Amino acid sequence: MVCLQLLIIRHGDPDYIKDSLTKKGKREALLLCKRIEKLNPDFIYSSPLGRAKKTAKLATKTLGREITVLPWLREFEGRVGSGLFKDICWDRLPEDWTRFDGLYTDEWYDCAMMKGTNVREEYQKVARGLDELLSKHGYQHSGRIFKVTEPNHDTIALFCHFGVECVILSHLLSVSPMPFWHNFAALTTSVTTVVTEERRKGIAAFRILSFGDISHLYANNEEPSFACRFCECFDDDTRHD
């Protein structure tokens, strides 16, 4: 690999009550293990939440490398709404959020839907954490580009969650997280690959090579989880809200 490579990996099928993995989630993580072994990340970071840590442990068990826990990789804690009706940012109904043009811009957090919420504050926590991590690995965020202070070919694995993955991608690309949250789905144990491109010396940008790849599940006839998705047709007997 001739660039810095980020592997953003969602946890396995979750048992949210126990903050762990279901039996299916453990199977998914073990199938992911073979793939991670080939990718051979130099550095492994994990969310502090149990379902992500368990996935990281199972998926990297053959590597024998330290797993470093980063608090900002936990699931995104920003909430929209008010009073008793505050809820996660990525379950908004299409008719409720798409009417706000501002949510499609890089000033999305100034939109009326976000006013009076903790979303911008929580977003900035993730952004600061990500920038600090990338700086340690030789890439300093500067506006919408990255200054290369120490070019390298490191592969970094981030075991985390769907909501925060969208925030990470949003910050790397300087775009709103709202389309990522609502129009993309990173299924359980999916791998998103992001790499640097340094076309001019000392100046880099990030490019997504693949999003939500679950080929390790298909290769082993493991049915993908429905977690984070909604019904395809209204009359389907799958999740509506």
Predicted regions and their residues:
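Active-site-proximal alpha-helix that buttresses catalytic centers in soluble enzyme cores
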Residues: 2-74
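Active-site metal-binding loops of divalent metal-dependent hydrolases
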Residues: 12, 162, 212-214
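A structural signal for well-ordered alpha-helical segments within the folded catalytic domains
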Residues: 30, 50-54, 124, 128, ...
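Secondary-structure boundary motif
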Residues: 38, 61, 139, 199-200
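Short glycine-rich phosphate-binding loop at a beta-alpha junction
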Residues: 42-48, 146, 155-158
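Phosphate-handling substructures
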Residues: 64-137
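Alpha/beta-hydrolase fold catalytic core
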Residues: 131-150
